[in-house]
Swiss-Prot record:
Biased composition (Pro residues): 227-238
Compartments in which it is found: Nucleus
Pfam families cross-referenced by the UniProt entry: Chromosome_seg (PF13889), DUF4210 (PF13915)
Protein name: Atos homolog protein B
UniProt-annotated stretches for the region Transactivation domain 1 (TAD1): 436-444
Keywords: Nucleus, Phosphoprotein
Domain remark in the UniProt entry: The protein contains a transactivation domain (TAD) which may be required for transcriptional activation of a subset of target genes.
Biased composition annotated in UniProt, kind: Low complexity: 130-148
Protein family per UniProt: Belongs to the ATOS family.
Length: 538
């Protein structure tokens, strides 16, 4: 902390120095002691305190000029002066850093002393107190300061005791009294101490006219006017220095004191910085004009692996949304399970029988060697054919129950027309195992005499085990499926009927043996579609 103190001294002998010119009595009506303590070093904050002491109204002492030595905390050090300060003020380099004038109107440390304090915080001057009986005037009269240095380099005090007696009083030499509300100007270097941390010196104000000459408009410190920064504006509030902050940092405008810059919060997303920018300070002012990240535009002709992955991900997302729209009832409520439940695939809808016939279960293995003999009777008897059967077994049993086999007989080797049958008759399909033993013989009667040309339909023949005596009113839960035969029929444009596509069969691996002690018998059920019963060919 720097301390600038102005006080009224008692009647004592002045300390004459070799570089201080004599001051006659009555010349100075008040004094100002300017100085700072170097104990803080260059890293101490730029805070100043100006103390003005005045005695009670009845004390009258002849004015004397005193010179105060520097504090004894450090040895004398050489001050850095600006160009021309030493020659203009007449100070040798070995003088101490604290030089001032003391007004001898009594030492203001006794009883009845009124004081005023001024704290210079950065560039703001705050008056902390005042007294209606305090009186302090400046020294000699000089020319007024240039208007370019009056905005930030002045301290404004008010003399409450003496009225204006003509003329302007400045810190210099003038034989006249000071006016009321006089403007006391401090050295420019004194304010530089608050900005650069005590690197600028405090120069003594000596006798002579206008110790700070007016700077010319042409040059400043040897630089051309176009490279010289503009001076301060008219008197008024001192402008506060503000540094440029990136867009992600928030500027604290509630305090004018200089302090550490606010930290950037983690996770704050600011404007994207340009990688090729060489001016880091100018980046926040134009980087917000850059376009933000956009979703990649999918090119329908893009055949690269990345393009295919993007298209696949987009199709999967659209299909998931479509499934959610069509089947909201298939999803479990969110509160039913702590984990998200995926939507049930529509390919698994239906009963166990439909899932087996359509091949919606993953097969556990295949068995080769099964064959099937196909024959028909009716208005005519076509030739019997024997075709191989592709048998697949599954492992879907959860209670050690026998899982059925699925046999598929492909009719494509018989030609495009398939296996020709009469419109009314009986179809016989005999299944043989690899040992050429009969597994099951299916007999299905049909009547498609009303089937129009170029249409198709199917028949599904089932064999159930049901308790004896309950053939008519047996519930579906009390019957067991043993065998199933699925036949597909199609009529040509000429009206001829034939089997086409394939024939699918369901059968058990071993004979069903019930240990319930109740008699069971086989029950055959043949079903056909209705409403509509026939469908036109695609």
């Amino acid at each position: 902390m720097r301390h600038v103190q102005a006080e009224l001294s008692p009647s004592s002998e002045p300390e004459a120095g070799p570089s201080q010119p004599p001051v006659t009595q009555g010349t100075l009506q008040g004094g100002l002691l300017m100085g700072y303590s170097p104990a803080g070093g260059a890293t101490s904050p730029g805070v100043y305190q100006v103390s003005i002491f005045s005695p009670s109204a009845g004390v009258s002492e002849p004015p004397r000029a005193l010179k105060r030595p520097a504090p004894s905390t450090e040895g004398p050090r050489e001050l850095k002066r600006g160009p021309g300060l030493g020659a203009r003020e007449g100070l040798p380099p070995e003088e101490p850093s604290t030089v001032g004038l003391v007004s001898p109107e009594g030492l203001g440390l006794g009883l009845g002393v009124a004081s005023q304090h001024f704290s210079h915080h950065g560039l703001r001057v705050v008056e902390q107190g005042g007294s209606a009986t305090s009186s302090w005037t400046s020294g000699t009269q000089s020319t007024p300061w240039p208007s370019s240095n009056a905005s930030c380099n002045t301290l404004h005090t008010r003399d409450w005791a003496f009225p204006d007696q003509g003329g302007q009083g400045c810190l210099g030499e003038s034989p006249g009294p000071a006016p009321s509300g006089q403007l006391h100007t401090l050295d420019t270097d004194l304010h530089n101490l608050a900005q650069i941390g005590g690197k600028s010196p405090v120069a003594r104000v000596g006798n002579g006219s206008n110790p700070w000459p007016r700077e010319s408009h042409g040059t400043a410190n040897g630089h051309s006017p176009e490279h010289t920064p503009p001076g301060p504006g008219p008197p008024g509030p001192c402008p506060t220095k503000r540094r440029l902050l990136p867009a992600g940092e928030a500027l604290d405008v509630s305090s004018e004191d200089e302090g550490p810059a606010p930290r950037r919060r983690r996770g704050t997303l600011g404007c994207p910085l340009a990688a090729n920018s060489s001016d880091a300070k100018a980046t926040p002012f134009w980087s917000h004009l850059l376009p933000g990240p956009k979703e990649p535009v999918l090119d329908p002709t893009d055949r690269s692996p990345m393009g295919r992955r993007l298209k696949g991900a987009r199709r999967l997302k659209l299909s998931s949304l479509r499934t959610l729209r069509k089947g909201p009832g298939l999803l479990s409520p969110p509160s039913a399970s702590p984990f998200p439940t995926p939507a049930v695939s529509r390919t698994l809808l239906g009963n166990f029988e439909e899932s087996l016939l359509r091949g919606r279960f993953a097969p556990s293995g295949h068995i080769e060697g099964f064959t099937a003999e196909i024959g028909a009777s009716g208005s005519y008897c076509p030739q019997h054919v024997t075709l191989p059967v592709t048998v697949t077994f599954f492992d879907v049993s959860e209670q050690n129950a026998p899982a059925p086999f699925l046999g598929v007989v492909d009719l494509n080797p018989l030609g495009r027309k398939g296996y020709s049958v009469p419109k009314v008759g009986t179809i016989q399909v005999t299944l043989f195992n690899p040992n050429q033993t009969v597994v099951k013989m299916f007999l299905v009667t049909f009547d498609f005499s009303d089937m129009p040309a170029a249409h198709m339909t199917f028949l599904r023949h089932r064999l159930f085990l049901v308790p004896v005596g309950e053939e008519g009113n047996v519930s579906p839960t009390h019957r067991l499926l043993c065998y199933l035969l699925h036949l597909r029929f199609r009529s040509s444009r000429s009206g001829r009927l034939s089997l086409h596509g394939d024939i699918r069969l369901l059968f058990s691996r071993r004979s069903l043996e019930l240990d319930t002690g109740l008699p069971y018998e086989l029950q055959a059920v043949t079903e056909a579609p209705h409403n509509p019963r026939y469908s036109p060919l695609p």
